[in-house]
Amino acid sequence: MASLPVSFAKPDKNGVITCKAIMLKEAKLPGMSYADTVQIIDIQVDPPQNVELRVKMLCASVCRTDILTIEGFMAPTQFPKINGHEGVGIIESMGPDTKNFKVGDVIVAPTLGECQVCSSCRSGRTNFCQNYGANESALEPDGTSRFSYIDSDGKKKLLYYKLGCSTWTQYMVVDSNYATKLNEIAPELPPPHGSILSCAFATGYGAVWLDAAVQEGDSVAIFGVGSVGISAVIAAKELKAKQIIVVDRNEYKLKMAMELGATHCINSEKLPEGVTPSQAVRKLTPKEVGVDASIESSGYDVFMNEAMKAAIHGKAKTVITGEGIYENDRIFFDFKDFLFGGNVVGNVTGRVRIHSDFPGLLRKAQEPVIRAGMDKILGYDAATMKCKYEVDIREGTPALLKALEEVENVDCVKLVIKLNDY
């Protein structure tokens, strides 16, 4: 990213920038298509206020939760909105009270901030900051939006946010308390890699590295090997886990996991009748006691139960990283498993704190083996600087709709949306 272009769109006399963005008009309900709700439009992005940053976005990557947002299952559920929370960009301008950033810095904006002074931050045991938690209000902290558009009646209407940032736009505004710089530590990291670091890679890698605290010689089970699960495999391999057991139904992704360090793979749809995934995992462990760490990244509630059942009760930690669709937003675990030592913890962005841990993750991302794993997740071709599944916002709505449909392809691990040249 050292040689990225630094030209910016010219604001109008009020400091407003007009650019292209991907708008979600309404939730994609059963029977509806992406064309019914998703479209590329021109929007207006107001100047940053207070401690905000206005950012020229380079690219965004599509998380499974972004698809759930389109379908109306994930908070905040207000529409119309700009979707997306994974992405990387360059600071174009800053609010008057912003500190520790400058125009031209390359940043990502993970879901959680880090004040470094609340009891949670000082504990070192969590990234759930009490002052800068996940913003699910769909607006800036002051209750307003920096995004607007002109509707078909010529009226100005506001656009809501996704988790305080919204990355599916050529320019966004974000509270600087939720941003962290890439350029000082990893200036050569390609933008798509920076994008997945902001959520998917941090979530999977951090679940193994920080939450489960896997040690050399441990056994690890990973349920679901999309981009988060593959990142967990990379971490387990790097931390010298002895057994890395992956569970999924997608043979392409299981094969990728094996190529990146998994020692055993289990296709959950090809198990003998009556055998559950957790039983299959336990059978692979010494004395069939289970694994030292169990990571759930599929987002399916049944796998969350299975992940806990696969772990050594009383010793192992089961880390839940995936968000899915559950009846009344509730997940039911077997009480007996809890009573006899089941240890389940929720995870957002891998327990990675944006100031205390993210710099270390950036350094890891530059190590050849880990960088090669990120290349695999993205299907990245260094010669062309393109990803296997990539669409440019400037190609228009039809190309975007086609790309969103392709997210369900068996060999699609991560879709990248290019927003500006790099």
From Swiss-Prot:
PANTHER family: ALCOHOL DEHYDROGENASE, ALCOHOL DEHYDROGENASE-RELATED. Involved in the catabolism of cyanogenic glycosides. Naturally occurring substrates are the aliphatic acetone cyanohydrin and butan-2-one cyanohydrin, which are the aglycones of the cyanogenic glycosides linamarin, lotaustralin, linustatin and neolinustatin. Can use various aliphatic ketones and aldehydes as substrates, but not aromatic ketones. This is Aliphatic (R)-hydroxynitrile lyase. Its EC number is 4.1.2.46. The keyword Ligase does not apply. Optimum pH is 5.5. Belongs to the zinc-containing alcohol dehydrogenase family. It comes from Linum usitatissimum. Changing C129A: Loss of activity. It catalyses: (2R)-2-hydroxy-2-methylbutanenitrile = butan-2-one + hydrogen cyanide. Pfam families: ADH_N, ADH_zinc_N. Homodimer.
